[in-house]
Swiss-Prot record:
The name this protein goes by in its record: Amine dehydrogenase
Function of the molecule: Catalyzes the reversible oxidative deaminations of a broad range of amines, amino alcohols and amino acids. Catalyzes the reversible dehydrogenation of serinol in the presence of NAD(+) to give dihydroxyacetone, ammonium ion and NADH, while NADP(+) shows a slight activity. Is also able to produce 2-amino-1-propanol and aspartate by the reductive amination of the corresponding keto alcohol (hydroxyacetone) and keto acid (oxaloacetate) in the presence of ammonium ions and NADH, and that of acetophenone from phenylethylamine by the oxidative deamination in the presence of NAD(+).
Family: Belongs to the amine dehydrogenase family.
Tagged with keyword Oxidoreductase: yes
Subunit and partners: Homodimer.
Catalytic activity line of the entry: a secondary alkyl amine + NAD(+) + H2O = a ketone + NH4(+) + NADH + H(+); a secondary alkyl amine + NADP(+) + H2O = a ketone + NH4(+) + NADPH + H(+); serinol + NAD(+) + H2O = dihydroxyacetone + NH4(+) + NADH + H(+); serinol + NADP(+) + H2O = dihydroxyacetone + NH4(+) + NADPH + H(+)
Length: 360
């Protein structure tokens, strides 16, 4: 069994606890928390299982890493604390652990990552012998392994378009939704998510990886964006009120330009309520979220994935798929050489040993 730590127990971490516990090759050995109120609580409770797992949460990072766990699922956020997340991840890699994480988007495409992100991790790999695989949903499998798999079914391909279409009203991340994405802010507020070069920083690596896998050279990466205001005030269950006249929806594209044309496109359509921008793309079933890949060519191929978890919640379902991809890579990484890995390095593997396995 591969001794595995889950670091962080928020929206991603509680799903990671469940994924590690369900994996037949992994053994949950520790859970690291930042909130003092969670110290001493059982991992089963934090993972919202109906049973205890016999692993108590701790905030003693040094003690956990000193025990030399073989793997760490780093589930703490890197969106609003990238420096701290990078320090945590390099610390775990330096301890010799295989680390998987959805944090730190620049490291999804590590070959082109800024030196300030890449170099500390490479130094930690050299010093401690650990590894890192960073990936998610979108950016993540929704615009790397999935579109590339589908492209292999085509005869000719004109455009690969990856879409995330989501209603954020079910999210429980008010800081990210209000300040990074800008929902509920005045229309003259410039959300960080749409600042020039930020979409490319987050999603450009996915464009580059797809281009590399497809054997094409990019002329450049372009960005487009649009915003819409709410017509009426809306109230969400988890994040409160969003006022009429404030930002209610954004739409942007990150485009990989090949021979002057946008051939690889990542598009996001994000709303805080379905009433905003009804003329923009919506999930095919009218639900609150979907990931879609459209291959324009011969044949035309369209695949939509709608994942749900935690009471039919699609944001939780999306997070669960990211966790599944990461946790499912741990045993492969343990057998591989130490290093930095990306989605093209790591095979998408079947759920060996998990078919029919029940989890409460």
């Amino acid at each position: 069994m591969i001794s595995t730590v889950v670091w962080g127990t928020g929206n991603v971490g509680r799903l990671a606890i469940r994924a590690v516990e369900a994996h037949p090759a992994l053994q949950l050995c520790a859970v690291i928390v930042h909130n003092p109120a969670k110290v001493g609580r059982d991992a089963g409770e934090l993972g919202e299982l109906d049973r205890l797992l016999g692993v108590e949460a701790t905030d003693d990072i040094e003690a956990v890493l000193a025990a030399r766990p073989r793997a760490v699922v780093y589930a703490a956020s890197g969106d609003v604390r990238p420096d701290e997340a990078l320090a945590d991840i390099t610390r775990a890699v330096r301890s010799g652990a295989v680390v998987v994480s959805p944090a730190l988007y620049p490291l999804y495409d590590h070959r082109n990552a800024p030196p300030e992100f890449r170099d500390p991790v490479l130094a930690a790999v050299t010093e401690g012998g650990g590894s890192l695989f960073a990936s998610g949903v979108d950016p993540g499998w929704g615009n790397d392994v999935l579109p590339l798999l589908l492209s292999g079914l085509g005869t000719t391909i004109d455009v690969i378009r990856c879409q995330e279409i989501f209603d954020y009203s079910t999210y429980d991340q008010p800081d990210s939704v209000r300040y990074l994405v800008g929902m509920g802010q005045p229309m003259d507020y410039e959300p960080m998510m749409l600042m020039p070069s930020i979409p490319t920083m987050v999603w450009g690596g996915q464009i580059r990886m797809m281009a590399r896998a497809l054997g094409v050279e990019l002329d450049e990466i372009r960005e487009t964006s649009d915003r819409r205001a709410l017509d009426t005030t809306v109230t969400t269950r988890t994040m409160g009120e969003f006022g009429a006249g404030t930002q209610g929806a954004i739409r942007f594209e990150v485009q990989g330009i090949v021979e002057g044309e946008p051939r690889i496109v990542i598009e996001h359509v994000t709303r805080i309520h379905p009433s905003c921008a009804p003329d923009w793309p919506v999930p095919p079933d009218g639900g609150d979220g979907a990931h879609r890949v459209v291959i324009e060519g011969r044949p035309r191929i369209e695949v939509t994935i709608e994942a749900t978890d935690e009471g039919e919640n699609r944001s939780a379902g999306g997070n669960a798929t990211a966790v599944g991809r990461l946790v499912g890579a741990i045993d492969w990484l343990v057998e591989a050489e130490p290093g930095l890995y990306d989605a093209l390095d790591i095979p998408l593997r079947p759920a060996i040993g998990r078919l029919g396995r029940k989890q409460s």
